[in-house]
Regions:
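Short Gly/Pro-enriched turn/cap motifs at secondary-structure boundaries
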Residues: 35, 68-69
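Conserved short histidine dyad/triad with adjacent acidic residue
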Residues: 60-63
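Core segments of cupin and vicinal oxygen chelate
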Residues: 2, 11-53
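Short aromatic/hydrophobic contact patches that present stacked aromatics
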Residues: 7-9, 45, 76-78
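Core-facing hydrophobic residues within beta-strands of well-ordered domains
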Residues: 2-5, 74
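Conserved beta-strand in the GNAT
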Residues: 55-57
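Vicinal oxygen chelate
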Residues: 12-16, 69-93
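Residue-level detector of transmembrane insertion/anchoring sites
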Residues: 45, 65-66
Length: 93
C-alpha cells in the first residue's frame, strides 16, 4: 500500500522566478535540472528534506489556471515548519 508522497509536480508560469523562490528563498536543494529541447521546456527537481521532491515544469505559453479554488489542478502545497513566525519573517524580506 501507499507509504508516503514521493513528489509533487507543478507547472509554473515563470521558470526563473519559481526556481529562485524554491531554491533560494525556501532553500530547497536542486537535485537535477533538464532542458527538454523537443518540448522547449525545463524540468527542475528539488529535494525537500532529502525525503520528498517538488518538480517544477515550464512550458511555452501554458494555459492559465482558472482563478477559482474549485478548478481542477493543484489547489495548494503546504509545508510543516519548526517556527512559523521565523518563516514568515524570512519570506517577507
Amino acid at each position: 500500500m501507499l507509504k508516503s508522497i514521493h513528489h509533487v509536480a507543478i507547472i509554473v508560469s515563470d521558470y526563473e522566478k519559481s526556481k529562485h523562490f524554491y531554491s533560494v528563498i525556501l532553500g530547497l536543494k536542486i537535485v537535477a535540472e533538464h532542458f527538454r529541447k523537443e518540448r522547449n521546456s525545463y524540468k527542475l527537481d528539488l529535494a525537500v528534506n532529502e525525503v520528498y521532491q517538488i518538480e517544477l515544469f515550464s512550458f511555452p505559453s501554458p494555459p492559465l489556471r482558472l482563478s477559482f479554488p474549485e478548478a481542477t489542478g493543484l489547489r495548494h502545497l503546504a509545508f510543516s515548519v519548526e517556527n512559523l513566525e521565523e518563516v514568515l519573517k524570512h519570506l517577507k524580506k
